Regions:
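Conserved beta-strand edge residues that scaffold enzyme active sites
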Residues: 17, 81-82, 107
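A short hydrophobic/small-residue beta-strand
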Residues: 73-74
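Rossmann-like NAD(P)H-binding beta-loop-alpha module
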Residues: 46-47, 54-55, 61, 65-70, ...
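Mid-domain beta-loop-alpha active-site segment that forms a flexible
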Residues: 104-109, 152-172
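A generic secondary-structure micro-motif detector
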Residues: 53, 78-79, 166
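N-terminal glycine-/serine-/threonine-rich beta1-alpha1-beta2 phosphate-ribose binding loop
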Residues: 1-58
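Short, contiguous clusters of charged residues that form electrostatic/catalytic patches at enzyme active sites
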Residues: 38-41, 62, 108, 171
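Short beta->alpha connector loops at strand-helix junctions that form conserved
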Residues: 14-15, 77-79
Length: 172
């Protein structure tokens, strides 16, 4: 749906099953579908303006590292890749002169605050949190279904558990 909505010309789907399924359903001559990032080198004469990296968990780190050389700016919505692989990401960013913009709210706020030359003398940054949905409940009485039941939206199991247990704050 998004590829059609934004008139995407090139799409990379790394997961082989998803790639085959999508390609079968979208036999559109206007859309080039690839199964690896190396294929992009064949079609790009110059760098892409923006790339969004939003694969959940550490699965997003390798594709993020692979695409950096093909893009002017990489927008990363994957906090696990930033936290666990920042030294690798930063090395590739410098090597390929690619700009970085984090999308996750806490990472974006910190990044944005440090972009202002007046704020370059920051010593500490404090990240606050509500305490989560189980702050005043006994852990013995909390069930898996409680943690998976987000009151506002469906986020999938991993993100719901990370949110309910405050693990997302560790990554942030």
């Amino acid at each position: 749906k998004q590829a059609k909505l934004f008139n995407v010309k090139n799409l990379v789907i790394i997961n082989k099953k998803s790639f085959e399924k999508f390609k079968e359903k979208n036999n559109n001559n206007k859309l080039n579908i690839y199964n690896d990032f190396e294929s992009l080198s064949k079609i790009f004469k110059k760098k892409i303006d923006y790339t969004m990296s939003s694969i959940i968990g550490l699965d997003g780190l390798k594709p993020t590292l692979d695409i950096i050389k093909y893009t002017k700016k990489i927008v990363i919505a994957n906090k696990e890749s930033i936290v666990c692989g920042w030294n690798l990401i930063e090395k590739e960013l410098k090597k390929h002169k690619t700009k970085f913009i984090p999308v996750d709210s806490e990472h974006f706020s910190i990044w944005y605050a440090t972009q202002n030359k007046k704020n370059n003398n920051l010593d500490k940054i404090y990240l606050t949190a509500s305490g989560g949905p189980f702050l005043k409940r006994s852990m013995k009485k909390i069930r898996l279904s409680d943690a998976l039941n987000h009151p506002n939206w469906k986020m999938g199991k991993k993100i719901s558990i990370d949110s309910a247990t405050m693990m997302n704050k560790v990554f942030e």
